[in-house]
């Protein structure tokens, strides 16, 4: 039976189909030319499960990062022989057969450092090099040095790195920016995508796609040469995110791609595996067991996909904000992801033009225009007056306001009148004395109230400024910087997240204790310091009073967190 003629939107989506077909081969080629390292839960099978379930270590990531001292198959064979013998000591067996990750030395900054001096001094402390790794190490080698976030995070993370790189550039470390771009390009060439982090157990997923923005950042220093140099890797990453689109029918989803009923193409977060995460093994098993009405594999996939989003975890993905087992990440089309995909398409167009391929540049521009229309049609809640995620189950835009709603402004994909409404919604519902709330829901999860995260502060600040909403943008920067400074004055460190209901308090919630370091906070703090202080009078600490050159506002009273989305 002949299919009905496609509607006009479907035709628009099909115009650049050759791009998807051509680049689908690129990601396949990358995967076929290298042997993908196996994660520790596969390498060690029942031994890995038993060690994690025995809770030998306070942090499940410890054993996931442990390095086998010999062939894992031999270790597993020895374990099977010994495990039922009387007096068998699992902890002793692990200590004999594995090299556990070393605790990093606690960094003690010199006395009397300003905030800027402290951050500048941290860059070498947070720099790692893994050109060579042990044969069975879960750590993936990278050709150049890189900057890690800090704390328990001993490896490089994808989306964290962009905000870290903003700070490196602000400090004049363009060599480190170039090294990190080269490392991510290496991962794309080796694995077909940029994994969540450079660990074997992160290979089944990616994270918010900032690589094109990293290349664009490098181009500020190196010019169009950077765009031309990394165009092939940007194309491969785009192919990874759009993998399977050529076979999709209207109303279907495949991996990271969603095709809506009118042919609009959007993206979602996805993990290729549906098992517990090795770095959070026991926690994931407990979450799955707590909801016997859902298949465990479905819950595992949604947990992993939430990790791919960077927002692990948040009421944003959950039907019941108080029950993690109700999350359904894969049935939600995220507004921030699709904003980043729009930006990727725009940068690919620019890079193609720089490389002299105007035809390809036009095709990417067509894709970006189609996606922008999709964002405006499906990811805007007209009743509420803000951008939000789209629900594939209810076939409606969701009602919850989150800090992700500022991403269309950040990438210049928003309509001007909607940007004005976003400024009002942000100031009314998300802005707090210590910065921008992630959501207005208190769930106990770390990507919810009262936590504020540096990358979201910067996205909001830049996004609002893009549309002339400077007052709210400066409010966010000033409030967050005050929070960072107060915490630094008391504890002499920058942390992963902050409690924005007040100032001077690190954030809480989630699966692990608060981490210090901290890469993306360092980067955003430097950018904001240079934003709020006049160029003729740069500041090394946050001023005691708000600079007169910027608009001043009354201090915000703390808003009560809402119990439900």
Curated annotation (Swiss-Prot):
The keyword Signal applies. GO terms for cellular component: periplasmic space. InterPro entries: 6-hairpin_glycosidase_sf, 6hp_glycosidase-like_sf, Glyco_hydro_37, Glyco_hydro_37_CS, Trehalase_periplasmic. The keyword Transmembrane helix does not apply. The active site is at 312 (proton donor/acceptor), 496 (proton donor/acceptor). Residues 539-565 are annotated as: Disordered. Keywords: Glycosidase, Hydrolase, Periplasm, Signal. It holds the Pfam family Trehalase. Belongs to the glycosyl hydrolase 37 family. Monomer. This is Periplasmic trehalase. The gene is treA.
């Amino acid at each position: 039976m002949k299919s009905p003629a496609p509607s006009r939107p479907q035709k628009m989506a099909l115009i650049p189909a050759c791009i998807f077909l051509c680049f689908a081969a690129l990601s396949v080629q990358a995967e076929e030319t290298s042997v993908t390292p196996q994660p520790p839960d596969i390498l060690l099978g029942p031994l890995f499960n038993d060690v994690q379930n025995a809770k030998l270590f306070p942090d499940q990531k410890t054993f996931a990062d442990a390095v086998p001292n010999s062939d894992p198959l031999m270790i597993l064979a020895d374990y099977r022989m010994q495990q039922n013998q009387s007096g068998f000591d699992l902890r002793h067996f692990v200590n004999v057969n594995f090299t556990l990750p070393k605790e990093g030395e606690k960094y003690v900054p010199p006395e009397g450092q300003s905030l800027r001096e402290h951050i500048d001094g941290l860059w070498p402390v947070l720099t790692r090099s893994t050109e060579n790794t042990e044969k069975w190490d879960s750590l993936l080698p990278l050709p150049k040095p890189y900057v890690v976030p800090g704390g328990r995070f001993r490896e490089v993370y994808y989306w964290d790195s962009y905000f870290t790189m903003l700070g490196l550039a602000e400090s004049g470390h363009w060599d480190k920016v170039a090294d990190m771009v080269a490392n991510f390009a290496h991962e794309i060439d080796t694995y077909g995508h940029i994994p969540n982090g450079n660990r074997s157990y992160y290979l089944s997923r990616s994270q918010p796609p900032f690589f094109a923005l990293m290349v664009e950042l490098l181009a500020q220093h190196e010019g169009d040469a950077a765009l031309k140099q990394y165009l092939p890797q940007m194309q491969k990453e785009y192919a990874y995110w759009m993998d399977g689109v050529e076979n999709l029918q209207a109303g279907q989803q495949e991996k990271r791609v969603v095709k809506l009923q009118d042919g609009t193409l959007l993206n979602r977060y996805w993990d290729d595996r549906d098992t517990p995460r090795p770095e959070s093994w026991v926690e994931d098993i407990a979450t799955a067991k707590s909801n016997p009405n859902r298949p465990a594999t479905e819950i595992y996939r949604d947990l992993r996909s939430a990790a791919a989003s960077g927002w692990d975890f948040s009421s944003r993905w959950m039907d019941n904000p108080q029950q993690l087992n109700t999350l359904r990440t894969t049935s939600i089309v995220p507004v921030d992801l699709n904003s980043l995909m729009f930006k990727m398409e725009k940068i690919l167009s620019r890079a193609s033009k720089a490389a002299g391929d105007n035809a390809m540049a036009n095709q990417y521009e067509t894709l970006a225009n189609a996606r922008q229309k999709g964002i405006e049609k499906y990811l805007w809640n007209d009743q509420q007056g803000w951008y939000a995620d789209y629900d594939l189950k209810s076939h409606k835009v969701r009602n919850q306001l989150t800090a992700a709603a500022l991403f269309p402004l950040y990438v210049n994909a928003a309509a001007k009148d909607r940007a004005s409404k976003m400024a009002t919604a942000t100031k009314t519902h998300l802005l707090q004395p210590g910065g921008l709330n992630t959501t207005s829901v208190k769930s106990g999860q770390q990507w919810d109230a009262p936590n504020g995260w540096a990358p979201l502060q910067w996205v909001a600040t830049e996004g609002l400024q893009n549309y002339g909403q400077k007052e709210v943008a400066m409010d966010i920067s000033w409030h967050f910087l005050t929070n960072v400074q107060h915490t630094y004055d008391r504890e002499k460190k920058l942390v992963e997240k902050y409690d924005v209901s007040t100032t001077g308090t690190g954030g809480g919630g989630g699966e692990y204790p608060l981490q210090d370091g901290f890469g993306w906070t360092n980067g955003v703090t430097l950018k904001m310091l240079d934003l709020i202080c006049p160029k003729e009078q740069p500041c090394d600490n946050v001023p005691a009073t708000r600079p007169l050159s910027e608009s001043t506002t009354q201090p915000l009273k703390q808003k009560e967190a809402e119990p439900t989305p």
